[in-house]
Amino acid sequence: MQGAKNNIYTVSRLNGEVRQILEGQLGKIWLNGEISNFSSPSSGHWYLTLKDHSSQIRCAMFKGRNQTVSFKPINGQQVLVKGAISVYEPRGDYQLLIESMLPAGDGLLAQQFDALKMKLAAEGLFAADTKRPLPKNIQRIGVITSPTGAAIRDVLHVLARRDPSIEVIIYPTQVQGETAAQSICQAINIANQRLEVDVLLLTRGGGSLEDLWCFNSEALAHTIYNSALPVVSAVGHEVDTTISDYVADIRAPTPSAGAELLSQDSDNKAQKLATALSRLQQSAKHYQLKQERRLSLLEHRLQRQDPKRTLQQFEQRFDEMQLRLESALSNRLHILSRRQQLLASRLEQQSPKHKLAIEGNRLSYLASRLQDALQDKLSQSEQRIQYAAHQLETVSPLATLSRGYSITTDIHNQVADSADKLTIGDSLQTRFRHGQVISTVTQIKLLE
């Protein structure tokens, strides 16, 4: 009896422990039943009873939750609700706090949706590290949808407004019905076989859960996951969510939003063009300065090395540098011209012709200045080489001989620069401009 007294519960304690047991063990559950005693007071909360043929349970759905319900519940309606058990301790009542509510028919589909979602998540099909980024410069979009639906009209309208240069290839498919999922899978596989687009946009307009059910196919989920092309899912309205949204690399809430996501504003393209031209101009200027420094270095080396060999090496290097400079300039101008033509073609429908003409003239002017500067530099270098050769020629021993002088050496090939170093009978060799003579010393006369 004493032990029993020590374990006496208060009412509050009992209700509290019952609450912990019910809420902790059951968690969130799905419950099917008929609505009765439905009320919607001014607070915006909903209060109702769910019952079957023999039992009933009180339920509450608060304002923040019931705003997502697409219909107004009525007494006698069969519904499927998802919620958690909660105990209202002051009265000792337990109730179901509803988080979502669907008509009974849609409710079965919702259960299947949740089950498939959990399965695919466990298999890793929704993992963030498997999502592929969108290409940076999208030129061609593959749209997988009905060719006659409202979705394709919305997509084409947005793309025509934002970036008319983007090409659209439609892979026609069913988007509703029993064979729609298989049809969508085939369209995705065809696009992956052809590899003619940069990204795929899977889309259709809004509808009921049953209308959109083909986008909750397990086979479609695996097809999207295995696609070599990035996939954007834009199915239904913003409140609609499908399995394809979870598997796709990116989800867009509507078809129009998907087209917005995959296109760039024309103003952004014009800005990118201006930036690209500026970078090319800076690159050309940097290349010119670099080559000028290299030419100056070669000129400095010429002055420090053996004249003839240095001249020969410098002439060879000069020719090589000239060819490389001409080739580099030609390639630069060719690449720049090609990029300008490509950008002009993309922007043609937006008619920025005046701006392109101005930039083209500036580019031609800069190219002309660069060509003139390089030609001037080459001419200056040639003049410096000719001057250096002339200077070397003026101090050459052969040049001295050409002016009427001669050079006399002894048998050891040492220059005979003084008579007191010679003796009678020595053999001497005297070199003139056009030949030499051998002589013998017969008389030595020193000058005082």
Swiss-Prot record:
Bidirectionally degrades single-stranded DNA into large acid-insoluble oligonucleotides, which are then degraded further into small acid-soluble oligonucleotides. GO terms for molecular function: exodeoxyribonuclease VII activity; nucleic acid binding. This is Exodeoxyribonuclease 7 large subunit. Heterooligomer composed of large and small subunits. Its EC number is 3.1.11.6. InterPro entries: Exonuc_VII_L, Exonuc_VII_lsu_C, OB-fold_nuc-bd_dom. The gene is xseA. The keyword ATP-binding does not apply. Keywords: Cytoplasm, Exonuclease, Hydrolase, Nuclease. Pfam families: Exonuc_VII_L, tRNA_anti_2. GO terms for biological process: DNA catabolic process. One of its GO terms (cellular component) is cytoplasm. Belongs to the XseA family. It is found in: Cytoplasm. It catalyses: Exonucleolytic cleavage in either 5'- to 3'- or 3'- to 5'-direction to yield nucleoside 5'-phosphates. It comes from Shewanella baltica (strain OS195). HAMAP family: Exonuc_7_L.
